[in-house]
Structure formats: C-alpha cells, structure tokens
A protein has these predicted regions:
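UBC/E2-like fold recognition across ubiquitin and ubiquitin-like conjugation systems
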Residues: 1-170
Length: 170
C-alpha cells in the first residue's frame, strides 16, 4: 500500500523536526501507527506570564492535509484569550481558507497549504506571548487580560503554569 500525499508530508515534517528541533516546542506522534495524531510540548515563552510552563497539546490532521488545517487542542489546562475552555486553539492560521464571515481576518491570515507544523507552532508560541483580544475564544480570559492583566488573569495563568510543571511528563 502506498502512502497518501498527506501522510508522506507529515512523515517528512516529523523527520525534519526530529533532525532539526525548533526552540520552544517538541513534537511526536501520539501513537506510532497514526501519522494524523500528534502530541506537542510547548515551553512557555520567556518574559511572558507563561514562562516556565510545559503545555501539552494535540494536533489532529485531516486526511486532506495540507489543503485543510489541523485542529489543535491543549491537553494541559491553560488560561488564554485564544484558547477556549475545552482547550481548542482559535488562531487565524488554523482557520479554514476563504473569507471570514465575521470580518476579523484577512484571507492571507488564514490557513494556506504552505504552512507546516513548525509555522503553526511558532504562531501558537507567538499567541502565548501576545494574545489577540479582538477575537477571543475564551471571553472571560480576554476580559481579564484587558481589564486585570496583572491581577486575576496573572494569578490564573500562574496556577496553570504550576500545574503544567507538575503534570508535564505524565
């Protein structure tokens, strides 16, 4: 049986990330028999509230990748305006190609088949450093980030960072 183009592309990207790791995250398969289910560990970026955290997330790739984007879900609890309460990540690069019916995103900000796991992860790390409060997935976190960044928001993030350190390698 021949490998599909998407499986071949994912295998190449995984091999490249293993050969040339990128600072700030590591990636691997959840199960060695399924190229479409990845687990990533993201290190909280320096000089951010997330610094010191080790956040686990899953990437689920569609069978027609790279024509459509993967879904990303944090497994580790995280308090962030662009991550909903169930852990789903909401950033432009992971949104289906085409027009944004809500008018928040330009077509070029959305998913393009040239994106890779590396570009996705760099975008997620950037999101941790600089949340987008204009298009929140977690309205409560966005409100706290805008109104009480150094108070309640910071306390909730610090709790998530501590918890992530305790459970990082479970």
């Amino acid at each position: 049986m021949t490998e599909t183009q998407s499986a071949l592309l994912l295998r190449r990207q995984l091999a490249e990330l293993n050969k040339n790791p990128v600072e700030g995250f590591s990636a691997g398969l959840i199960d060695d028999t399924d190229l479409y289910q990845w687990e990533v560990l993201i290190i909280g970026p320096p000089d951010t509230l997330y610094e010191g955290g080790v956040f686990k997330a899953h990437l689920t790739f569609p069978k027609d990748y790279p024509l459509r984007p993967p879904k990303m879900k944090f497994v580790t609890e995280i308090w962030h305006p662009n991550v909903d309460k169930s852990g789903d990540v909401c950033i432009s690069i992971l949104h289906e190609p085409g027009e944004d019916k809500y008018g928040y995103e330009k077509p070029e900000e959305r998913w393009l088949p040239i994106h890779t796991v590396e570009t996705i992860m760099i975008s997620v790390i950037s999101m941790l450093a600089d949340p987008n409060g204009d298009s929140p997935a977690n309205v409560d976190a966005a409100k706290e980030w805008r109104e009480d960044r150094h108070g309640e928001f910071k306390r909730k993030v610090a709790r998530c960072v501590r918890k992530s350190q305790e459970t990082a390698f479970d």
